[in-house]
Each structure stands twice: as C-alpha cells, then as structure tokens.
Amino acid sequence: KNFATTAAHGNGDDNWYVAQIYTIAAAGGEMKSIYTPPVDSQIAVPAWSPDGKSVAFISGIMSDEPAVGGDIFIVPAQGGEAKNITPGIKASASWLTWPSDGKILFGEDVDGESGVAKVDPTSGALETLARGPGELNAYGWGTAISLAADGKTAAVIRQSLAHPPEIWAGVINEWKQITSRNAALKPAWGEAKSIHWQNDGFNLQGWLLYPANVDWAKNDPAKKYPMVVQVHGGPSSMQHSAWPGPHSFGVALSAAGYFVFMPNPRGSYGQGEAFTRANVKDFGYGDFRDIMTGIDQALKQAPIDEHRLGITGWSYGGYMTMWAVTQTNRFAAAVAGAGLANFQSYYGENQIDKWMVPFFGASVYDDPQVYAKRSPITFIKNAKTPTLVLVGDSDGECPTPQSYEFWHALKTIGTETELVVYEHEGHMFVDPAHQRDVIERVAAWFNQKLK
C-alpha cells in the first residue's frame, strides 16, 4: 500500500547527501518524511518490514552516491527515533532486504571480501551465510541478490579476479552457476593475494596482484619486480578482488609485469563504521600512513624492487596520488586521475560540496586551515616525482581546474609532468576509446619510469 524511498528537495548532484526517508501511498498523495539523518551521515536502500510497521535502512558516512556502506537502522513507519541494530560490527552493510521470516538479509563488505549475512532486528543476533573473495554483484554498486519467496533461495551475480560476472542461483552459499555468457573471458593478469598489516592500532588489509606469466617455482630468487600502488576512490569504498571494470587499469599493469598493491586504508569500508569514519578531519595523514606501512608489508612478502615504486588512483585515489608526491620521494613515478589538488579552491568549484562538511567538520569559510592542511598544493614545493595528470573536461565531482592547478604547479617548480584532458568526459569516462587511452597512457608512463 505504501512505498518507502530516500528523497531530497531540488535536483542538484549532491542532494542525496541530505536526503531523508519518505513514505508515500501507492495510490498517490503527499510524501511524508519519517526520518532525517544527522549531518554527518547519509542514508540508503530503505526496506519495509514484513508487517509494514517499520522501515530498515543503511546509514553511515558515505562519500559517493552509489557506494553504500554503514550500519543497519530501523525506524517506525510513522516516524520517530531510529535504532542502530548492528552497532560495532566489523563490516559494512552494502544492501538489505527484509523477507517474510522477519530477519533482515544484507550484504556485507568485510576485510576486502564480500558476503551475505542476516540480523535479527529484535536481538541484534548476527549470522554470516556466505563470505569470500570477489563480489556478489557487477562492478560494486547496487543490490546484489534476488531472493525467492521461501527466503532461502536466491539468484546472485558472482565475480572475482579469476572469474568474470555470471548469474548463480540456489540456496544461499550453495549456489550453482547457471549462465556462462562470459566464459570466453580469461584473466590476463596474475594472482591476487590478500595481505594484512597493522598501523596506529588498526588491523589493515589490501590486495597484492602479482605479475602475470611468471613461473614462481622457477623464478630467480634474486629477481625483483616493480610495483604500482593503486588507491581506490571514495574514500568510502573498498577494494575487492573483483573482475575489472573499464576503469581498472591495475590489471593491465599486472599483465605488463608489475606487482599492483591495492590497499584499504582507514576511511574504507570493510572494518565497521568507526573505521570508515577514522579519516574524518584527517585526510592525507592517517590514511597515507596506512598506505605507506602497507607498502612496507608488501615488500616483506614479495620480490618487489623498492626503488621502482609507482602510485596511481582516480578520484580519492587521484587525490592520494597528488598528496603522496608532495609528502615523500619514495615513488619513482605517479599517475593522478581526476584528483583534488586544493581543497580551498575545490570547495567553490565542485557540484557535490555537501560531502565536505561531514568529512572536514566545517565549511571552508568557517575553517579554511583544516582544508589547507590537507591540500597537496600547500606542499607542492616538495614534489619531485614525475607525474602524469588525467581528467575529463566535464568532471563535476573532481573538476578539471583541480588537475590544471596541480599540473601548472609542478611545471612551475620544474618537476616533470604531463596533463591530458579528455573531451566530453565526466568523472567516470564512458567513451571506450578514452577508457582504452587511459589504460595505455598509464602503462606507458610507468613503463618509461619504472622498467
């Protein structure tokens, strides 16, 4: 009889950051707001209880609209106080559904892996039903499962770095593959291994993708390989060992003979909401230390040449690349995609500025120093690393001027740099020719500097 949805007034790109939960009768009528989240949280995927008396939803600090993660809350259907039923779990809920047996079924990102769990909304008792490497959806975002009426059988999209996406069905965690539409796709990259390390009291995880076409049983123990660090976007996101999408140039580097380290520093999903919030007002500091200590761990575990290290990433990963080259000379080459150079100028340029107050604690006009302290441009004179800068000319999330500013600053101080701006591209490129060009340019830049 009624729908539950998230909505906000206006049509701006960032209105979802201030969205509320509304109900509306199926027959039409006025929408009724039943929940307004605090300013430091976002909400997503509301679902009715079987008896129609409550609405469940996911709430947490989320940096990107489609990338959902947080705890599970329940609010009365008529409005009122919301209750967190998963406080303190060391995982991030990514989607949910509320079947007729009364227990909430949800996806969980945990420690670099993907899974399905259920929680009793009354007692909070949790049960993990399935968990493993890869992802239970296609390219990371959206509900990953279609549940049958019995509440036990489901269809799901499964994928990993070893297997492309296919549909599986059956009892949860006893799924059988029912499609083979991508059977012709074979990985051209090496094996991915999960690695763990500790820093500042956090237990951290990342994926180390090995170079392709190396017989490790016969490999010369003295031979070492270059490594590129690829930092994920977000920062509220998580690096899975998932089949690559069109923007995953790390696999191309593995195919070309590189180790590729893909860390999940603080601020990522997968370790609980407190971990995701651990980079609030701390961009570039704790998260950067997590990445650098992760590199140390990778060097201990694999034959990596510490003198041939590179760093790259897109969006938050592009920011972290810009930040890294102003903080250390450890990297011999860098590629910054759609990065953020100057948070003070960025505040007035981007179309999604509502994400910034939850992460920085105030607007740039109220506390400019908190933005300056975390801006790569503030420390630009330290940058010595040759850096390729890539961006789309219509990017509203990480606007083109940010890349211009960083490139111009590097040129001014005499650091080797190149800038490539792609026509008619936003934050995520859609033209296959441009996607291919990015992969080829990234590989060529690192081949020139690290091989």
Where are these regions (language model features)?
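A flexible loop/linker signature enriched in serine peptidases of the S9 family
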Residues: 6-22, 33-47, 56-73, 84-94, ...
